[in-house]
Amino acid sequence: MSSDYEKEVLRRTLEHERGTWREDLRRRFAPWFDPLVWGFRCHDGWSGIITELTEEIARIVGGPEGAPDLRVVEVKEKLGGLRYYVWHVPEKHALAIAEAKQRAEERSFETCEVCGKPGRLVQSDGYWHTACPAYEDPRSFRGD
């Protein structure tokens, strides 16, 4: 970690994630999520998709021991879909991991990011997100 700022962001992120699926994923698949300074930048509705994708990557490579240099560097929502960025993927597993990521990203466009119920891609005031009817208005979950 390169700066005091990043260390403070990580400290706050880990504090925020304490007791959640995010903390569990970091624990189960360490060192893959070390440091993931910015945390998981999406709502809890995609927790199942993210967990299943991570478990699938683990099956593909043989667990963290099979790819000790692999790093999940960012997990976020972008333009309504899941983005899961991984570095240092073993070349022999690159295609299988890319296909697994593609399937997870496709599922995210059918799953409400907030609650995990079936959803659809919607646009509201220039903001694209995947939501069920209860969360189509971004103000319903962003606190605006």
Describe each region flagged by the PLM.
Residues 1-5, 9-13:
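Eukaryotic low-complexity, non-globular regulatory regions
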Residues 5, 16, 84-85, 127, ...:
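Sequence-level detector for tyrosine residue identity
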Residues 8-11, 20, 46, 114:
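Aromatic-residue detector
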Residues 15-98:
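Interaction interfaces in information-processing and related assembly proteins
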Residues 95-144:
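Cys/His-clustered metal-coordination modules, chiefly Zn-binding fingers
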